[in-house]
Swiss-Prot record:
GO MF: ion channel regulator activity; toxin activity
Species of provenance: Californiconus californicus (California cone)
Keywords from the named record: Disulfide bond, Hydroxylation, Ion channel impairing toxin, Neurotoxin, Secreted, Signal, Toxin
Written domain comment of the UniProt record: The cysteine framework is V (CC-CC).
Name assigned to this protein: Conotoxin Cal5a L3
GO cellular component terms listed in the entry, alphabetical order: extracellular region
Main location: secreted
Family: Belongs to the conotoxin T superfamily.
Residues making up the signal peptide according to the UniProt record: 1-22
Length: 76
């Protein structure tokens, strides 16, 4: 019996949380959208993986280069 009461309470709580999050999403302001965009950009920047690339010229060793809008290469 306790199991069913707990299950019903959990289902009611999740339905309340879903409706609250849906109402917040519908009334989002520009500042909330800016925060979301900034978080997405930070997450995408953290996902950047270094890629080995050959430097031009004879006798040069490969340097790790970042895949980034502004490509920055650095020596090892």
């Amino acid at each position: 019996m306790r199991f069913y009461i707990g299950l019903m309470a959990a289902l009611m709580l999740t339905s309340v949380l879903r409706t609250d999050s849906a109402s917040v999403g519908q009334t989002g302001t520009k500042s909330e959208l800016a925060v979301i965009e900034r978080v997405i950009r930070q997450r995408d920047a953290a996902d950047v993986k270094p890629v080995a690339r050959q430097n031009e010229g004879p006798g040069r060793d490969p340097a790790p280069c970042c895949q980034h809008p502004i490509e920055t290469c650095c020596r090892r």
